[in-house]
Amino acid sequence: MKYIKKLIYVLLLTVATQVATAQIKILYGPYLQNVKENEATIVWVADKPSIGWVELAPNDGTHYYGEERPKYFDTTNGVKNTSLLHAVKVKAFTPGTTYRYRIYSQEVLSHEGINVIYGRVAASDVYKKNALTFTTCDPNKKETSFVMINDIHGRENIITKLLNNANYKDKDLIIFNGDMVSEFKDEQTIFNGFMKESIDLFASEKPMYYARGNHETRGEFATSFQKYFSPKEPFLYYLFRQGPVCFIMLDTGEDKPDSDIEYSGITDYDGYRTDQVEWMKELYKNEDFKQAKFKVVIAHMPPSADLNIWHGQKDVLKKFVPILNELGVDLMLCGHLHRNKYEEPSAGIKFPVLVNSNNSVVSVETNGDQMNLEVLDLDGKVVTKKSYTAK
């Protein structure tokens, strides 16, 4: 009798364990972050606490199942992270090379002392589909192209139309220049607002780079922004190079003074912008920056000498512009104003500033010593067209 009871208990426990682990799945992703010439970060979200890892394979025509692929785990200081959200940074790539990859999440049922009990595994499909791929950046690539959108404010229904108008499938990379949602309230806001659509379109295989806007700084989830975007970078401001273009990604912070009642005393963006100036002062030493034909700044809020501008734009003018003038940048691409605007170089701002509206897309392609830019509206009509010659 005792044996039967014990057997029933074991069977029930087995069934319960199987039920508990049967539903693990990848909720969102994967999507690429901070793809550079020799590294890339891959991010995804599972629906249960789990460990995560990425497998990599060369894009050499062999079947993905042809051999065991090397694994790269989501870890912190040598310990595999148990989390819903996973981010894995892989290094030692070859520039301009395409790689195949696969993501995994294995549920962690319990972790007591030194004992860890694992459940089932969810993974991206390489059986019924081709493995996902990405291509690393290449500073020696002769030409490059990119598109930029901004100020979507959760209107995911216009993303596909804007990107299609710019022939995004033929471009090397995509840039999000801030205010993709109106408030960072929770994870669902991110994915329902713009990332699910982006993943479905391109973000699993085409690099996306994100400059934070002033609306991503708001909401109880705002401090989690970097867990999802640039999660393995030291800061949200950084530099990367693709072909003849060096991109300087800046974070312009909030638009009002830090003391404004809207921020409840939780912000210090004046100090944050000062930190970025100190970082920019070192860019002239960077080889990618020095050797690039074109130097393009991505920053959400544009600088302006208008007397009616708010504090954030004024601080960008005061702090960012002098060092950018010294660095000799070729173009600054901004958003924020919800209208199209173009400012030619002036005595104070020695580079052109293009502001993209919330209902248009910027499309850029290089051709030898020329960098050609178009701004297209929702109907695909060209509303601005510019060309820049390498200095």
Give the role of each language-model region:
Residues 147-150, 173-179, 206-214, 296-300, ...:
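Active-site neighborhood of phospho(di)ester-bond hydrolases with catalytic His/Asp-centered motifs
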